């Protein structure tokens, strides 16, 4: 990793992004909270309106039947979004762990519609080409997001959207998750000021993601006649303390080289067109009167 070209991004005061919209697109309940919970809280604090989109139905996680797991993850997904401050949630319900078999055209088309309908400026999601990605839901989502970001601004793709009042939309920039070791990243985001919201979101990931590990440990110790002062006197305190102490180690390590308490990593893509092209500059310098 070329550390010379890594930019450190910190919270900007005064809500400089007020009026802008971002969409965080993840596959599973716990993806965004772990991989970008701090960034999403930061963007909202800076004035963005955020929308959370989950592509899978999470039927494989939750400890119950497929139907029970789907419902449990759906309910917890809304709580995760509320903990960060998202305005709304969209669940697309593709079959968990089998998204490599779905129609990418279908997923891409739904994402294009949402980007246009919500007037999205910034997208946060997976790196479609990230190394070591084993989960088919992750790379299927990442690829569809990448394609949708490009096609969203093409008026001849899904022209019925335009006729229905949802104009083509150019995505301005993207933050790609650092989801696996050795995936590329060029931006380190200081999430220290937003760590409490990240913790709150992870705590809501109880069907999967370890949000209730603290209360479970507290209950096991109580049966043995023991307690950990760290876990406090109630289940909610136990869950938050457990997340803070044991589930944030990666984010501490990401911040250490930059003297940050907590950080998240991303591969950032700036898709904004330059304000002035070389053609504009050439015309200004060389145009003569007729």
Where are these regions (language model features)?
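Internal alpha/beta domain cores that form substrate/cofactor-binding pockets in large enzymes
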Residues: 51, 78-80, 87-177
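C-terminal accessory domains and tails appended to enzymatic cores
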Residues: 2-9, 13-18, 154-167, 181-290
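Active-site rim/loop-helix segments in enzyme catalytic domains that contact anionic ligands
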Residues: 1-118
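Hydrophobic/aromatic ligand-binding patch that stacks against planar heteroaromatic rings
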Residues: 42, 144, 148, 201
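Histidine-centered active-site/metal-ligand motif
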Residues: 26-28, 135-138, 205
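A generic structural signal for short coil/turn motifs at secondary-structure boundaries
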Residues: 61-64, 99-101, 131-134, 184-187
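Short, solvent-exposed loop/turn segments at secondary-structure junctions
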Residues: 58-59, 130, 180-182, 194
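Short, conserved loop/turn and helix-capping segments at secondary-structure boundaries
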Residues: 67-71, 139, 192
